[in-house]
UniProtKB/Swiss-Prot annotation:
InterPro entries with a match to the protein in the record: Arg_succ_lyase_C, Argininosuccinate_lyase, Fumarase/histidase_N, Fumarate_lyase_CS, Fumarate_lyase_fam, Fumarate_lyase_N, L-Aspartase-like
Organism from which the protein derives: Solibacter usitatus (strain Ellin6076)
Enzyme class: lyase
UniProt-recorded name of the protein: Argininosuccinate lyase
Entry similarity comment: Belongs to the lyase 1 family. Argininosuccinate lyase subfamily.
Primary site of residence: cytoplasm
Keyword terms of this UniProt record: Amino-acid biosynthesis, Arginine biosynthesis, Cytoplasm, Lyase
GO cellular component: cytosol
Gene Ontology molecular function: argininosuccinate lyase activity
Length: 460
């Protein structure tokens, strides 16, 4: 069946029907479509389009359709144009002629906006719950090694020593922002579009506020033309998905490196790795590589809808049907990646000796030395030059920080008094970084406790 056709002398061609149909993918909206139509039936009763008996008959039929739609058999042989048409056809089969009234004063333009908004707000909540789990795993792993020291990197070169929990808390902060981003996306989606009609507003005095309350929306949209041409709420959701995937990809990249033989910091669990069909020794970080790979796919989902929307005239255009596949795909890939990340974190263990040795044998203490000189009264630019020459001399002599004695340091530069030798130990320099947000031991312990407390307050 079609929800249109009187103006046409013949039906659509077979090629066009195949090309334009969306049931294969928008069927995921069926539960939202049914709930929205049930609320709309109540609104139609309130304006006298449906009697109480007719409304009850329609709502009961929708309940039956909703239950049956859980089975794949429900869709077998369906050739409907989209999920809305399928639902109306099924309604007619159960409720008869009264089903013809359900679309009174309603357009598929607002209906698909409603369905998508409902789906996105629920999916946003689900993804927040998965982010919550990842953040909890990060804190668990941080608490296992509260005093472990690792080199921090800039430009993929050893830069300064940091505590392992400080590093993990950096990702906690990223994922916390992601958690809030999905909350923002849900809030922006959570306004009712019903009553907007195709673009000019419904011709019936529907109680939009009552429908909003019935469906759990926080309010109603304010402009019917905006509703018809709007997919900002979908872009907001896709942006949240994309940024989260980028954060997951960065974590994956780090851990692919840190678990390699060259680093040897991390041991990934057998359950999240795979082997080689040829090389018996291999233990490959496939889970992390797939997360990294899927991030590009999700970036593409956002890009595709941005490009689709960029040149559309007001208001609705059929191009906007192309929002569903990127939305669904981004949500699926992110959900799978979050579950995988949580499993990876849970299975991973740190070998503290390896990153500690990497920190001790490199010049991650250089900034500590320069800042200590500055605290002792040497202008920082001069201190920077002194330490730079000291590092250069060490490189030429193939000396590690621990190879220097206090006497040799003082002989190299009189500004290096005997107490400076202690700063050649990375742990010593971190004592000066007891600042909120810094990597000092007490600061990190406080940050870890705060993160745990904050996680407990998040509403999922």
């Amino acid at each position: 069946m079609k929800l249109w056709g009187g103006r046409f002398e013949s039906g659509p061609g077979e090629v066009f029907e195949r090309f334009s149909g969306s049931l294969d993918f928008d069927r995921r909206l069926i539960d939202c479509d049914i709930r929205g139509s049930q609320a709309f039936a109540r609104a139609l009763e309130n304006v006298g389009i449906l009697t109480a008996t007719e409304r009850a008959q329609i709502v009961e039929a929708f309940d039956s359709i909703r239950a049956e739609s859980l089975s794949p058999a429900f869709y077998e042989g369906a050739t409907d144009e989209d999920v809305h048409t399928l639902v109306i056809r099924k309604l007619k089969e159960r409720a008869g002629a009264v089903a013809d009234k359900i679309h009174t004063g309603r357009s598929r333009n607002e209906q698909v906006s409603l369905d998508t908004r409902m789906w996105l707000r629920e999916e946003s909540t689900d993804l927040q719950a998965q982010l919550f789990a990842v953040m909890g795993r990060l804190l668990d792993l941080a608490e296992m090694y509260p005093h472990a020291i690792i080199p921090g990197y800039t430009h993929m070169r050893r830069a300064q020593a940091v505590l392992w929990p400080h590093y993990l808390l950096a990702y906690f902060e990223m994922f916390l922002r992601d958690w809030h981003r999905f909350g923002d996306a849900r809030r922006r989606a959570n306004v009712l579009p019903l009553g907007s009609g195709a673009l000019a507003g419904s011709g019936f005095p529907l109680d939009r506020e009552a429908m909003a309350q019935n469906l759990g929306f926080e309010g109603i949209t304010q402009n019917s033309m905006d509703v018809s041409g709007d997919r900002d709420f979908a872009l907001d959701f896709l942006y949240a998905c994309t940024v989260t995937m980028i954060h997951l990809s960065r974590l994956a990249e780090d851990w692919i490196l840190y678990s390699s033989e060259e680093f040897g910091w991390l041991e990934l669990g057998d359950g999240v790795t795979s082997g080689s069909s040829l090389m018996p020794q291999k233990k490959n970080p496939d889970s992390l590589e797939l997360i990294r790979g899927k991030s590009g796919r999700v970036v593409g989902c956002l890009t595709s809808l941005l490009v689709t929307m960029k040149g559309l005239p007001m208001t609705y255009n059929r191009d906007m049907q192309e929002d569903k596949i990127p939305i669904f795909d981004a949500a699926d890939q992110l959900s799978g990646s979050l579950l995988m990340t949580s499993a990876v974190i849970e299975s991973t263990r740190l070998n503290p000796a390896r990153p500690a040795a990497a920190a001790e044998e490199s010049w991650v203490v250089a900034t500590d030395l320069a800042e200590a000189l500055a605290r002792a009264g040497t202008p920082f630019h001069q201190a920077h030059q002194i330490v730079g020459r000291f590092v250069l001399e060490s490189v030429r002599a193939n000396k590690k920080p621990s190879d220097w004695t206090a006497e040799e340091m003082h002989a190299f530069a009189p500004e290096f008094t005997p107490d400076f030798a202690a700063l050649l130990n990375p742990a010593e320099g971190m004592k000066s970084r007891e600042i909120p947000g810094g990597t000092g031991t007490a600061a990190v312990a406080a940050a870890l406790a705060h993160a745990r407390q904050l996680l407990g307050k998040l509403i999922v």
